[in-house]
């Protein structure tokens, strides 16, 4: 008996995932993202906030935000259910929704 050839359909698919900040919940957060000064937020947090926003923008997954541990990535509860936060300092946070690998409704806030 002759062996029958079985056709194989092998497709290699490359997917490029571009994660990014899709939207801002506050105009003031957008100002900081764009390298401008906000009068609403303390001047001593703005550079750190900008650095953390860049980190958020370049993250491909929520796990990326667990490093450095000082970010203290948290899933929030209550009124902020379905939002995450990372710390700027002990008082200020960057809050956002993570949808399909992108950050939405990003805002800098003192929600305590």
Could you describe each region identified by the protein language model?
Residues 1-88, 92, 99-112:
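Basic, Lys/Arg-enriched alpha-helical interface segments
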